[in-house]
């Protein structure tokens, strides 16, 4: 069931000092300055002494067709010497004089008490006489340069545009996060990632992604020995990793036992050593030819290998610049990105506090 539009009461106080309209004559006969026209659920028409709060005061010199324009609210009035017509609905068959509204802060007497109130003042000139037929036919198409008449009327055209908009395929908005992640990848990884996005989702996509990554890295670093199936080489790598972790742990314990006067406290934490050891044991093909090294408080690197999204706690954080290939210790804390860089034949793992591009 269609809901009826709610009507708001509008109070218009016509001020006709000359008494040329019916409103002015009634006000003079009652010795009052205003004639109130109330439009809403009910209609009222009476002379009054002063306007009410939030009312419209329409000052007119005589008969005319007046249209009060107050934002979304439009009030159309026909004031003649013998009658009054007013509406808040559309009334387009007649011409009207548009009257703008000026809000004013005033003091008026309301219900026997003087109160502060806002009234809206508007002044008409009487340049449009009542009931002048509007010569513009809304159904007639004017002759406009560069404009042709459509085969549809306005309602049909709006419905047609809406149907086309709803039936058109909607483009899926891509998330910004993959684009953001690609900024932290090296050229090889970004290329593989773009190729993987074109593949169909599912287990086959993951399998193809792994194969593509393996092929790209083998082409880029062909000089590395990729024979990883030999048992003796795997055992040798594991022993080297364990020796590196043991050396790092011994250095860390020696630094803690030494006094602060003789040796300053190191920024290498136990959590960092454990995280580095786990990364070394992953046997990443990009790091197989590099030996692990501990980063000093500041230094440089030769190239950025890759940046991974890893959440580490209580680790040294570095600010590094890819353009100058320098890094500097900032503090010890938590991070979400870890950069893998190389210096000579050493692998350095830097936790990113932030980076300058």
Swiss-Prot record:
What residue ranges are annotated as transmembrane? none
Q: Which GO terms describe its molecular function?
A: RNA binding
Biased composition regions of type Acidic residues, renumbered to the chain? 230-243, 250-260
Q: Is Protein biosynthesis among the key words of this record?
A: no
**KW RNA-binding (keyword) present:** yes
Q: Name one Pfam family in it.
A: BTV_NS2
What are the entry keywords?
RNA-binding
Disordered: annotated segments: 162-199, 228-268
Q: Which InterPro entries match?
A: BTV_NS2, NS2_N
Family membership, please give it: Belongs to the orbivirus non-structural protein NS2 family.
The function of this protein is: Single-stranded RNA-binding protein.
* UniProt protein name: Non-structural protein NS2
What organism is the protein native to?
A: Bluetongue virus 1 (isolate South Africa)
């Amino acid at each position: 069931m269609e809901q009826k539009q709610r009507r708001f009461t509008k109070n218009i106080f016509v001020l006709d000092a000359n008494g040329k309209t019916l409103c002015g004559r009634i006000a003079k006969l009652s010795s009052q300055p205003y004639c109130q026209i109330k439009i809403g659920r009910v209609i009222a028409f009476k002379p009054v002494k002063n306007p009410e709060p939030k009312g419209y005061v329409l000052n007119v010199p005589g008969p005319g067709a007046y249209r009060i324009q107050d934002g979304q609210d439009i009030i159309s009035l026909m004031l003649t010497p013998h009658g009054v017509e007013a509406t808040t609905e559309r009334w387009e068959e007649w011409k009207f004089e548009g009257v703008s509204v000026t809000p004013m802060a005033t003091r008026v007497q309301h219900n026997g008490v003087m109160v502060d109130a806002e009234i809206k003042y508007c002044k008409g000139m009487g340049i449009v006489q009542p009931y002048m037929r509007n010569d513009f036919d809304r159904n007639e198409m004017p002759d406009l340069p560069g404009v042709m008449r459509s085969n549809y009327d306005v309602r049909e055209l709006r419905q047609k545009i809406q149907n086309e908009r709803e039936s058109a395929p909607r483009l899926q908005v891509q998330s910004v996060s993959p684009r953001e992640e690609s900024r932290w990848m090296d050229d090889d990884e970004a290329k593989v990632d773009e190729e993987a996005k074109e593949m169909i989702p599912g287990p086959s996509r993951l399998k193809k992604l792994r194969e593509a990554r393996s092929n790209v890295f083998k082409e880029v670093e062909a000089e590395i020995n990729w024979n990883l199936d030999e048992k003796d080489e795997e055992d040798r790598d594991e022993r080297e990793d364990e020796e590196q972790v043991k050396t790092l742990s011994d250095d860390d314990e020696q630094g803690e036992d030494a006094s602060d006067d003789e040796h300053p406290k190191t920024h290498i934490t136990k959590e960092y050593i454990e995280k580095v050891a786990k990364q070394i044991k992953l046997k990443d093909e990009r790091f197989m030819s590099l030996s692990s090294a501990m980063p000093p408080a500041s230094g440089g690197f030769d190239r950025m290998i890759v940046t991974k999204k890893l959440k580490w706690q209580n680790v040294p954080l570095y600010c590094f610049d890819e353009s100058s290939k320098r890094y500097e210790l900032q503090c010890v804390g938590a991070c979400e990105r870890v950069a893998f860089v190389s210096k000579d034949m050493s692998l350095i793992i830097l936790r990113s506090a932030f980076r300058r591009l």
